[in-house]
Design a protein with these regions (language model features):
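A conserved beta-strand-loop-helix scaffold within acyl/acetyltransferase catalytic domains
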Residues: 2-85, 128-148, 154-295
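Active-site/acyl-donor-binding loops of N-acyltransferases
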Residues: 72, 140-177, 317-366, 371
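Register position in tetratricopeptide repeats
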Residues: 373, 407-408, 441-442, 475
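TPR alpha-solenoid repeat register
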Residues: 397, 431, 465, 498-499
Length: 520
């Protein structure tokens, strides 16, 4: 198989038709792998992502047969840089996985695994992967125990014992009464009674969000949800609210959200957000919230029953409760599927060869710069050096590493970074200024003079350049020239005089010439 790597939204946009064709052909595909949902999600997440795309051979006219969406996260910790490869949908999707034509899976999935194995990462998080056992074996067989530690992630919530690796779902017939007949007598009677109570009464009503009401209905839902879970998720609540609001809003505008609200008079007492996937004809219950002070009929059961009835009327074939085996879900006639969560780690616990993936460079630079600002110089230095191992002429890493080295007194090493920087960015005045400063710190005044003159040439209106040149000339015993330059600067014709000083290049004497030869 030939594998391409898709890394930009425009490239992904061009693949929409190809993606949808593969998605439609794949019985294992689900909404979190749909082009609409994934494109929206990838447009919003920080950090690099990429999609492995497989085709039979390297032919521009040949469509892809499989896609594997992934993302990269990098951390500077324990005196090194560690990269994690994660499933692209993690932190927003209940399910992750691979989209693949069934006839291509035996070639495409092992090819994906081989490509991932060759990348520079310390940990591979195969988290919340909804995939058949057959495909799971094809994927994981390329990561043998001799080379990788494999750790199964425990998805059982300790507080209440809910197992988030178990995912209940109800298969929907084409008739509402047929669905009810498959439930227990008690549940069937309860659902009929509750829906009748709501629909035959002026006291209660259910509305479904429209373009005009969606924002208000969503805020109602999120407010209820926050009240319920704030104490338990306090440290993450604000980010979860922001993420859920953004994802559901994007998805609604793509036609992927169904949001009914249950009302008692003019008081909203519960709301439920479901992701709908017309291509696969599935409803996927995402989140709910209710007014905990409401003492009327059970709002959760009413909204689920209402949603399932509507899904059947629309011709949908599955109502998925997503992750978590909460007992109430099974009263709706559910089966369950199990998803996989495993972390694969290199035996060394580090990136192979200690190198970072080039896609991580912006993240590593940001983290290293923040560590540098906080005074954590050792970790910051590691970050800068890892960048330069991959991209030796990275201007920002050269500059910041040079500054860090100079600050800790390693002027010779700092000089090497700034000298490279002046070749990478010869038009950057700051690079010449920094090079001049470290040369001064090394006592190499003739060389410092040359760098400072170049700084003056690039920034003629900056007094710092004139001061630096004057200091070097004074150190070299050329006070007469400094005095002449000062007099020229205050004469009416000072502009041309300063230009003469700026363009002047001293001829090094024998001692400074030798010094320059040693320091180069």
């Amino acid at each position: 198989m030939h594998i391409d790597i898709i890394e930009t939204l425009p490239s992904l946009a061009r693949l929409e038709d190809n993606w949808n064709a593969v998605y439609d052909a794949d019985d294992e595909a689900q909404i979190f792998l749909s082009w609409k949902w994934l494109h929206g999600w990838l447009s919003s997440i920080p950090g690099p992502w990429f999609i492995l795309a497989a085709k039979e051979r390297d032919d521009a006219d040949l469509p892809y047969a499989a896609f594997f969406p992934l993302r990269l996260q990098t951390m500077i910790e324990k005196s090194d840089v560690f990269s994690d490869v994660r499933m692209a949908g993690n932190f927003g999707a209940d399910y992750t996985g691979i989209v693949c034509r069934p006839e291509a899976e035996h070639k495409a999935i092992p090819a994906f695994a081989r490509i991932v194995r060759q990348m520079n990462w310390a940990r591979l998080h195969l988290d919340n992967v909804r995939i058949s056992e057959r495909r799971w074996r094809l994927l994981t067989a390329c990561f043998p125990k001799a080379s990788f530690h494999s750790t199964k992630v425990d998805k059982i919530i300790k507080v209440d014992g809910i197992d988030n690796s178990l995912c209940p779902y109800a298969t929907l017939p084409n008739d509402w009464n047929a669905y009810l007949d498959a439930l227990s007598t008690n549940t069937r009677q309860k659902i009929r009674r509750l829906l009748k109570q709501v629909e035959s009464s002026s006291e209660y009503r259910i509305t479904v969000a429209t373009a005009e009401t969606f924002d208000r209905n969503l805020e109602t839902l999120l407010g209820f949800w926050e009240t319920k879970w704030r104490a338990r998720k306090s440290d993450r609540m604000d980010s979860l609210i922001r993420s859920n609001r953004a994802m559901l809003t994007r998805s609604f505008h793509s036609g992927l959200v169904y949001l009914p609200t249950f009302w008692h008079g003019d008081r909203p007492v519960a709301a439920l957000a479901t992701l709908i996937e017309p291509r696969k004809r599935t409803f996927s219950f995402y989140m709910t919230g209710r007014d905990e002070t409401f003492e009327g009929p059970p709002a959760g059961m009413i909204l689920h029953a209402y949603s399932i009835r509507d899904a059947i009327a629309r011709g949908f074939v599955e109502y998925d409760f997503l992750r978590g085996n909460e007992p109430y879900k099974y009263s709706f006639g559910c089966k369950e599927r199990r998803i996989h969560s495993v972390v694969l780690e290199t035996r060394s616990g580090r990136n192979p060869g200690g190198r970072i993936d080039h896609r991580c460079i912006p993240d590593v630079l940001q983290q290293a710069t923040e560590l540098h600002r906080k005074g954590q110089s050792a970790d910051a230095e590691i970050g800068y050096r890892r960048i330069l191992e991959v991209e030796p002429k990275h201007a920002d890493a050269l500059h910041r590493l040079g500054q860090l080295l100079a600050a800790k007194g390693d002027f010779a090493a700092a000089k090497r970074q700034f000298r490279i920087l002046t070749t990478v960015r010869p038009d950057a005045a700051k690079a010449w200024q920094c090079l001049g400063q470290v040369c001064e710190s090394l006592g190499q005044y003739e060389e410092a003079l040359r760098q400072n003159l170049e700084f003056m040439r690039l920034q003629p209106n900056q007094p710092d350049g004139f001061v630096a040149v004057a200091k070097c000339m004074a150190k070299l015993g050329r006070m007469a020239e400094v005095n002449a330059a000062l007099l020229a600067a205050i004469e009416p014709a000072s502009v041309s005089s300063v230009r003469k000083r700026r363009d002047w290049r001293p001829t090094p004497d024998r001692q400074t010439a030798g010094e320059h030869a040693v320091s180069a």
